[in-house]
Curated annotation (Swiss-Prot):
A single Gene Ontology CC term: cytoplasm
Family to which this protein belongs: Belongs to the UvrC family.
Organism: Paraburkholderia phytofirmans (strain DSM 17436 / LMG 22146 / PsJN)
Disulfide partners: none
Protein name: UvrABC system protein C
Function (record text): The UvrABC repair system catalyzes the recognition and processing of DNA lesions. UvrC both incises the 5' and 3' sides of the lesion. The N-terminal half is responsible for the 3' incision and the C-terminal half is responsible for the 5' incision.
Key word Cytoplasm present: yes
Length: 731
């Protein structure tokens, strides 16, 4: 690892002299320690040096290079290993000049548990070896549809183990022919296991095997004169035939296929992933990568810039001498690099390596006229930004996850090592098809169309949200140079007759709700049902520490500026948003309530020294109907009523309703948990583990209360004496 210090002026010559001629990963950092870019190299010295060679750099790349203050490298044993490390670092560090997809770990699966009578269930989360998992599926709908099909054909159970263990008679699903009721021994273990095996084969796309086995089983029952069993198998075959006939999209084979289509439009890019499992099209999902605007040229929809000015920046800053200084005007131009095209013009590795790469072919198999995907030499050969995005998606989506045998792509992946790593990881051949034929071509066309529709819908929604944000600032008389940085926080209080009081805080910025920044606050120490006290508590807890930290930060910055000013009187302070330990102070604070709640908020903000002008109350209209709300201001301005057609009010109502939804769901969960476990928590001699075992065994508080002493004593960790004590306390 090479890790030069950034305390002195950055001198590329010293750093480059230390780099080895080995494969590895390099990382560029700016003066604040933020990661600018992560890349891999077959030869670190040649690759990194190419960024500091004037003759090869475009003005856009030079813009990024001007920001480099530190370089770190990690040597790996091979380029394939470097690819894996690069992918992990991009996900972990989210560099501003790398194309980044959200790391979606929440793909849904269909799970068959390792129970004696396996349960079929919808599942999200990490997989293990105790159970069987089928998927991932592109959507929850696809999983639930598959469960419904399996219920119709194989009648596997879907109930929780706690319910299964305590059934005394079949449930409604058995009565309507959706479950064989193993809970009451209506089917033996051997027959149920056969149904589970057939369901597994069906999910793996081996429907032909299932039909053949069922047919043999039906004839065997008939030859043994077991006509009822034969009729049951016949009905199962009929259900399966109906399901197979109803599949709207068929492939004619049992292979698994993923279809990847990329479309760029209006400065944004969409990747549409469609999944086919066992010949069944399970639907698709659209992905929108972050930081892609830094990889778009003006022709592709990126922001345009003054190339002459950028060229001057490049010439001023691209010297290997470490003592070059950029003037204020040039530095200001450098700030526009956020919107510049970087990724497509990153310098390639040395010409010799590039020529060697051009001689290689991506591992693809031809099928009836299909053309193999070729590696690129330069961006033009790959279809522009789409190929760059597709390569990033394949790396971030499939490395570490299941890879199907066939990938149908709209643009050729550029990196042979990427495909080789996928093959090694999957343990089977991975075929990449650029120009498929037949049904696969129809799937690709459909995926491309869905990508265009999703992208058009996103751009339309973004335009609408931006218009609403602008309308709100105009309505409130606010001046905001960058609407994307307008930060709105909204608070709501929720409880049931004073029980389980919770406050919610939702956050809106960059023209959309930011669910990762939502927070819930449990309200304690107040009179039940006192909304005013609850509002005071949540606002104080939310902003008190932020204000203290902001003040401390301001004091530190002032002291540092004073010290710098003594050394250089020409320095002036830079305007910045007040950042605190808990985040950035909002521009607008919405209070879901009328004059009383707004007055409480005004008092809290006055005590904390915050501007009351940012406080806006949203008084509900009749029945919470949009268009009847009144905006109430804490700084004394007259209340404002906006018509239901107002774009500003649409945004306020959207944020207010989201705060209400978030508060209600949290309150209900808290209330349900309290009601379910409160009596068990009061039992003497029953701790968390025993309480959990009781709930798992009896399915809830009602089941524990109904259990006999003998039933209680049968639970692991509960003796006969403790069972009698629990029984007495509950009765």
């Amino acid at each position: 690892m090479t890790e030069p210090e950034a305390t002195d002026a950055f001198e590329p010559k010293k750093v480059l002299a230390q780099l080895p001629h080995l494969p590895g990963v390099y990382r560029y950092y700016d003066t604040h320690g933020a990661v600018l870019y992560v890349g891999k190299a077959r030869d670190l010295k040649k690759r990194v040096s190419s960024y500091f060679t004037k003759t090869l750099l475009s003005p856009r790349i030079a813009m990024m290079v001007t920001r480099i203050a530190r370089i770190e490298t990690t040597v790996t044993r091979s380029e394939a290993e470097a690819l894996l490390l690069e992918n992990n670092l991009i996900k972990a560090l989210a560099p501003r000049y790398n194309i980044l997809f959200r790391d979606d770990k929440s793909y849904p699966y269909l799970k068959l548990t390792g129970h004696k009578f396996p349960r079929m269930a919808y599942y999200r989360g990490a997989v293990d070896r105790k159970n069987q998992y089928f998927g991932p599926f592109p959507s929850a709908w696809a999983v639930r549809e598959s469960i419904q099909i399996l219920q119709r054909v194989f009648q596997l159970r879907t109930c929780e183990d706690s319910v299964f263990n305590n059934r005394t008679r079949p449930c409604l699903l058995h009565q309507i022919g959706r479950c064989t009721a193993p809970c009451v021994a209506a089917i033996n273990e051997e027959d149920y296991a056969r149904d589970v095996a057939n369901a597994s084969r069906f999910l793996l796309g081996r429907q032909g095997e299932v039909m053949k086995e069922l047919e043999q089983k039906m004839h065997a029952f008939a030859s043994e004169l077991k006509f009822e069993q034969a009729a049951a198998v016949r009905n199962q075959m009929s259900s399966l035939s109906t399901v197979l006939h109803q599949q709207a999209i068929e492939v004619g084979s049992d292979s698994d296929v993923d279809i990847l289509a990329v479309v760029a439009l209006g400065g944004r890019v969409c990747v549409n992933l469609a999944m086919v499992r066992g010949g069944r099209h399970l639907g698709d999902k659209a992905y929108f990568p972050a930081h892609v605007e830094s990889a778009l040229t003006a022709d592709e929809g990126g922001l345009q810039e003054d190339d002459a000015a950028l060229a001057s920046v490049a010439l001023a800053s691209n010297s290997l001498a470490g003592d070059d200084v950029i003037d204020d005007e040039t530095a200001a131009l450098a700030d526009t690099a956020d919107a510049l095209a970087i990724a497509q013009e990153m310098p390639s590795e040395d010409e010799e390596n590039e020529q060697n790469d051009a001689a290689e072919e991506v591992d693809v198999a031809e099928e009836a006229g299909s053309e193999p995907a070729k590696p690129r030499k330069g961006r033009a050969a790959t279809g522009g930004i789409e190929a760059e995005v597709l390569e990033a998606f394949i790396a971030q989506h499939y490395l570490g996850n299941r890879v199907p045998p066939v990938l149908v792509v709209s643009h050729a992946p550029a990196n042979r090592e990427l495909v080789d790593v996928l093959i090694e990881q999957a343990g089977h051949k991975v075929t990449v098809l650029r120009q498929p034929q037949g049904q696969r071509r129809a799937w690709l066309t459909m995926a491309e169309q869905n990508a265009r529709l999703a992208l058009a819908r996103l751009l339309s929604e973004q335009g609408s949200q931006q218009a609403r944000t602008r309308a709100l600032t105009d309505t409130l008389g606010m001046e905001c140079d960058d609407l994307a940085h307008l930060r709105i926080e909204c608070f709501d209080i929720s409880h049931t007759m004073g029980e389980a009081t919770q406050a919610s805080c939702v956050v809106y910025h960059h023209h959309k709700m930011q669910s990762s920044e939502y927070r819930r606050y449990n309200i304690t120490g107040i009179t039940p049902g006192d909304d005013y006290a609850a509002m005071r508590q949540v606002l104080t807890r939310r902003y008190e520490k932020m204000v203290e930290q902001a003040a401390a930060n301001a004091a530190d910055e002032a002291a540092e500026l004073q010290s710098d000013a003594a050394a250089d009187p020409s320095l002036t302070p830079d305007a910045a948003e007040p950042v605190a330990a808990g985040g950035i102070l909002p521009t607008i604070v919405l209070i879901d309530g009328g004059k009383g709640q707004v007055e409480i908020a005004r008092q809290v903000f006055t005590e904390l020294g915050l501007d009351t002008g940012m406080l806006v109350g949203v008084a509900k209209g009749e029945g919470r109907k949009v268009g009847l709300e009144t905006l109430i201001f804490a700084d004394g301005r007259a209340p404002l009523e906006l018509g239901k057609e107002s774009a500003a009010l649409m945004l306020v109502a959207q944020i207010r309703d989201e705060a209400h939804r978030f508060a209600i769901t949290g309150m209900r969960a808290k209330r349900g948990k309290t009601r379910q476990t409160s009596r068990l928590e009061e039992l003497e001699g029953v701790g968390a583990k025993r309480r959990q075992r009781l709930l798992a065994r009896f399915g809830g508080l009602r089941g524990v209360v109904a259990a006999s002493v003998e039933d209680l004593a049968s639970v692991e960790g509960i003796s006969q004496a403790l069972a009698e004590q629990i029984y007495r306390q509950l009765h």
